[in-house]
Amino acid sequence: MKDISVKALAKINLGLDVVRKREDGYHEVRMVMQTIHLFDRLEISKNTSGEITMETNLSFLPTNENNLVYKAAKLLQDEFAIKDGVHVWLHKYIPVAAGMAGGSTDAAAVLYGMNQIFDLGLTREELMERGVKIGADVPYCIMRGTALAEGIGEKLSKLPPMVKCPVLIAKPQISVSTKFVYENLKLGSDMVHPDIDRLVADIREKDLYKIAADMGNVLETVTIPAYPVIADIKDHMMEHGAVNAMM
């Protein structure tokens, strides 16, 4: 096989809670994640150049080692002493800096695609083990579907498929830094946390309205005061028939 076309699915959070800040500075989370049918497409091909190259339809995206696509290709090229070069054409449709794992899912697609092209024989679990070296969300983007993530996001438990429903996504013209959000998160006794266990139970029951009622993202306590447009969008969605709206 010389080339392959791979879909890289976006993800949304149905629930996100931060349990505590660990001594190493990382935050321990519990979140329920779901892949959706919005995706980037990656055309991956091998050549004799020995180099990793990429191009994309978005001029502002890096196409060097600063892109997770490049890092994923480099990881497998180095580990398996692959002499051939790899070229990736990234057709980017997932909004950038939207919390939808756009970079991570592209990296996951490269791991999957190179595994096929070079006949590496890696299982999904083995791909996930390599994915975590690139980013905490990459293993989930390989797993896909509905899942509970714990730890710093790397401990994954598969959940029953989410009940099918339409999803509307709005991306305002803002870019929220993950570092900014976590640095300004105040984990106090007065904070209202989403009930992740109840949300998981709702998913098992396949009750859309219970799921909607129990959705929540504790990071909104930081983002909404800083970017009121998020609240405006949520209100607009609720006024026009959404069963719930969440960042």
Task: Set out the residue ranges of the language-model regions.
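ATP-binding N-lobe of GHMP and related small-molecule kinases
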Residues: M1-A98, Q116, L120-M128, I152, ...
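Conserved protein kinase catalytic domain
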Residues: G15, R30-M33, Y70, L111, ...
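Gly/Ser/Thr-rich helix-start
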Residues: L16, M100-S104, A136, T146, ...
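Generic non-transmembrane alpha-helical segments
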Residues: A72-E79, E126, R130-K133, D214, ...
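Contiguous, small/hydrophobic- and glycine-enriched helical/loop subdomains that border
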Residues: G85, A107, L111-L148
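Glycine/serine-rich anion-binding loops at beta->alpha junctions
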Residues: W89-F118, A136, V243-M247
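Conserved, helical-rich catalytic subdomain that frames metal- and/or nucleotide-binding sites
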Residues: M143, L148-N244
